[in-house]
Amino acid sequence: MAEPLLVVGLGNPGPTYAKTRHNLGFMVADVLAGRIGSAFKVHKKSGAEVVTGRLAGTSVVLAKPRCYMNESGRQVGPLAKFYSVPPQQIVVIHDELDIDFGRIRLKLGGGEGGHNGLRSVASALGTKNFHRVRIGVGRPPGRKDPAAFVLENFTAAERAEVPTIVEQAADATELLIAQGLEPAQNTVHAW
């Protein structure tokens, strides 16, 4: 992938949401920041938390919006503009209801599937044509509201698996950066 890349982990700010399904993007961004070897700092022009460095040998801007999920675009858009990153060089890491828990899928473009964070980013960029690292959380049981489900903490059984899933999603992000979409999909989708 061309440089620089903007890699964005989606989530909601604050301790109330820190361990919820909707914050998997933030969790992966934290792992990637550790791999870069830097701490997040507030980017004054966008308000997002940002780390700059190299992942998979590529120059990246790693970001976590500090606004609520459904407003993510208002910080991602200014970051993309500030760093002159076109949409096809943006990778958004997020939770995905339509994928089984723990599965990871990569794609470029497509719909938002009811994900308001993706909708906000697409609106701010003026296109849906950006890369996604989709981390499955599965559908809620019974008739539970999906919006409430993603804002709940993981079950005890899920919690035991989350650290491994987050590391795998970070690995998938680095593979996408290093190899491009199709080769990375061939590897990640076989996991």
Curated annotation (Swiss-Prot):
One function term, GO molecular function aspect: tRNA binding
UniProt entry keywords in alphabetical sequence: Cytoplasm, Hydrolase, RNA-binding, tRNA-binding
BP GO terms, sorted: protein quality control for misfolded or incompletely synthesized proteins; rescue of stalled ribosome
Site (Stabilizes the basic form of H active site to accept a proton): 95
Binding-site residues for tRNA, renumbered to this chain: 17, 68, 70, 116
Site (Discriminates between blocked and unblocked aminoacyl-tRNA): 12
Cited Pfam families: Pept_tRNA_hydro
Reactions mediated catalytically: an N-acyl-L-alpha-aminoacyl-tRNA + H2O = an N-acyl-L-amino acid + a tRNA + H(+)
EC number: 3.1.1.29
Domain of life per record: Bacteria
Keyword GTP-binding: no
GO cellular component entries: cytoplasm
NCBIfam families with a match to the protein in the record: pth
HAMAP family: Pept_tRNA_hydro_bact
UniProt name for this protein: Peptidyl-tRNA hydrolase
Source organism per UniProt: Mycolicibacterium smegmatis (strain ATCC 700084 / mc(2)155) (Mycobacterium smegmatis)
Gene: pth
